């Protein structure tokens, strides 16, 4: 059996950066680090980080109060997840009185900046993404009540009529072709639509590499990554949409060897 490894396999640079931030603050386990929800959507890495005293204390969407011990170490550090958070959440975390580090992926920070800027200018801001994903929840916090999330064509058609200017961005881990389709539809209704393709380069690269594997005639595709990761779930969906047997696994133990015999 021949195994072909995609060129872009592995964590993206934004995830690597968040891990680095947490580890810098942990100082090899000398100082405790609390993360507001999962730092990244990869259980195995989060388990590894927990052994370095980097502990997840928030919920998946970073909405609930942190479950900190009553005798929390005042030298501990709170680290923001790679997916980013809303301004309101940021204020809450800083008010905890603990040192604070931001692990937000810079690409997500750029999207938040575009949402904030255009909302302040009076634009209605349409965000293409999953309304339940922590990245989108964080972005909506910058929209000043003028944000609208769409995840498909039906959502787009259900949008209210906008009287003023409209801008559109995307969650960083969405399908490029779907964003192009929906932004094109919205531009037909609002010719002056300000469109920002904010799908990150790593996402595009991985989707492109997967399609290359499909075109090369691969008989099956194995996508390795967290079951809650938007990136890996999208890759598995993309592979399956091209009628390839697709296996989304987190570890080698998840592989069924008989499926490849």
Locate each region found by the language model.
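The feature marks the mature, well-folded catalytic cores of soluble enzymes
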Residues: 1-261
């Amino acid at each position: 059996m021949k195994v072909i490894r995609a060129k872009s396999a592995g964590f993206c640079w934004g995830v690597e950066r968040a891990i680095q931030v947490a580890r810098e603050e942990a100082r090899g386990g000398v100082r405790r680090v609390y993360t507001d929800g999962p730092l990244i959507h990869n259980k195995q890495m989060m388990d590894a980080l927990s052994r370095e005293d980097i502990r997840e204390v928030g919920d998946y969407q970073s909405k609930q109060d942190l479950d900190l011990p009553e005798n929390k170490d005042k030298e501990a550090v709170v680290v923001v997840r790679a997916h980013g958070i809303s301004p309101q959440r940021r204020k809450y975390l800083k008010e905890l009185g603990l040192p604070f580090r931001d692990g937000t992926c810079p690409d997500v920070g750029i999207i938040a900046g575009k949402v904030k800027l255009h909302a302040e200018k009076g634009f209605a801001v349409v965000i293409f993404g999953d309304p339940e994903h922590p990245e989108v929840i964080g972005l909506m916090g910058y929209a000043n009540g003028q944000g609208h999330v769409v995840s498909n064509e039906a959502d787009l058609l259900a949008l209210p009529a906008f009287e003023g200017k409209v801008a559109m961005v995307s969650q960083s881990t969405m399908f490029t072709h779907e964003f192009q389709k929906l932004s094109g539809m919205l531009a037909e209704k609002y010719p002056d639509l300000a469109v920002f393709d904010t799908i990150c380069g790593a996402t595009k690269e991985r989707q492109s590499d997967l399609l290359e594997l499909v075109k090369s005639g691969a008989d099956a595709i194995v996508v390795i990554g967290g079951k809650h990761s938007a990136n890996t779930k999208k890759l598995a969906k993309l592979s399956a949409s091209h009628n390839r047997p697709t296996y989304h696994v987190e570890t080698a133990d998840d592989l069924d060897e008989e499926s490849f015999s």
